[in-house]
Amino acid sequence: MDKAKKQELIATYSRKEGDTGSPEVQIALLSERINHLTSHLKEHKKDHHSRRGLFMMIGKRRSLLNYLESVDIERYRDIIKKLGLRK
């Protein structure tokens, strides 16, 4: 992910100016990295080192989503809908 894409995601999901640490921003950035790595692993099936990193990122995103769900269910539902994480 290049710098411009990262800044765009931060601007889209931040709650206020300069907000980079809110769960919404972290979830959005992790989702972008997960999507990129997933496409990489479809081509390079034996790249187990990157696969482990993918699983760790998915776990981190899951824990952030669990936190957000327990703190504010509306923000949780909003981020799920924006990112299209649930069917």
UniProtKB/Swiss-Prot annotation:
What SMART domains does this protein's entry cite? Ribosomal_S15 (SM01387)
Of which family is this protein a member?
Belongs to the universal ribosomal protein uS15 family.
Q: Could you describe the subunit structure of this protein?
A: Part of the 30S ribosomal subunit. Forms a bridge to the 50S subunit in the 70S ribosome, contacting the 23S rRNA.
Query: What cellular-component terms does GO give this entry?
Result: cytosolic small ribosomal subunit
A Pfam family reported for this protein in Swiss-Prot or TrEMBL:
Ribosomal_S15
Q: What's the gene?
A: rpsO
GO biological-process terms attached to the record: translation
The question of whether Isomerase is a record keyword is answered with: no
Species of origin reads Clostridium acetobutylicum (strain ATCC 824 / DSM 792 / JCM 1419 / IAM 19013 / LMG 5710 / NBRC 13948 / NRRL B-527 / VKM B-1787 / 2291 / W)
Q: What is the lineage of its organism?
A: Bacteria, Bacillati, Bacillota, Clostridia, Eubacteriales
Q: Which GO terms describe its molecular function?
A: rRNA binding; structural constituent of ribosome
What are the protein's UniProt keywords?
Answer: Ribonucleoprotein, Ribosomal protein, RNA-binding, rRNA-binding
Q: What does this protein do?
A: One of the primary rRNA binding proteins, it binds directly to 16S rRNA where it helps nucleate assembly of the platform of the 30S subunit by binding and bridging several RNA helices of the 16S rRNA. Forms an intersubunit bridge (bridge B4) with the 23S rRNA of the 50S subunit in the ribosome.
What is the superkingdom listed in this entry's lineage? Bacteria
Q: What is this protein called?
A: Small ribosomal subunit protein uS15
